[in-house]
Amino acid sequence: MTDFQSLRYNVDLVMVIDVTGSMGHIIREVRSAAISFHDQLSARMSEKNKRIAKLRVRVVAFRDMFADQECFIESRFFEFPQEHGEFSAFVASLKAKGGGGDGPESALEALSLAMHSDWTKEGDKRRHVIVLWSDARPHPLEKGGVNVPSALAGRIHSSFGSLTDEWELGQKCGMERSSRRLVLYVPEVSGWNELVESWSQTIHFPSKAGKGLQEFEMNTILDALANSI
């Protein structure tokens, strides 16, 4: 039998980032941590007698598809630490701008895109982790309709119920039920409250609505990630 302490985790992490006008702080935090991200996360995992065999990170950035032309920006998976430079360059290309005048953003659509990532199936133990940052409430998925970009329609759910079913029961997106984790940095508002109350394997850190998540730094985010793996 494999000893617990020798288990090696293959970790896929998808960072879902609100890149509307108020969110420059989080973009800078993620970029500044890129070089040491693997080492810092590995150190925190070692304290829990866990090891990372392979770490891949990708980004799904979002704005408001009802107000912004460039509403979703996706990267491929970058392997760490080898490709931290490419990851950092991608994050540096993200600009905090735009956002709908009505407040809500297209966060649930971005979460759906993240869930449909090309998740790893390799390794003794796997973790499929999504961490999402936003300081706004989400648009209802039911509102999307014809506004969903046609190229993305197959990966964006049309209702909160179907998104919930996919998280809890489905296998279409490739996330293993025992491996999936969701870490949310979002305000306690309608749209998020329903998700936090009903989704399993979900950790919520309440953010201040409209404040750009200024209260969070990468050290606390890394601690949360290590605890979720």
Regions found by a protein language model. Give the residues of each.
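Surface-exposed acidic, glycine-flexible loop patches that form ligand/cofactor-binding
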Residues: 2-8, 46-51, 114-128, 173-175
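C-terminal "exit" segments of structured domains
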Residues: 5-6, 199-229
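Von Willebrand factor
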Residues: 7-131, 138, 185-186
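Phosphate/oxyanion-binding active-site loops and adjacent basic polyanion-contact surfaces
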Residues: 23-34, 100-109, 156-162, 214, ...
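Extracytoplasmic/secreted cell-surface and envelope-processing proteins
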Residues: 23-26, 68-71, 123, 138-143, ...
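Sec-exported extracytoplasmic/periplasmic mature domains
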Residues: 35, 39-43, 96, 112-120, ...
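VWA/integrin I-like adhesion module and closely mimicked acidic/polar interface patches used
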Residues: 136-199
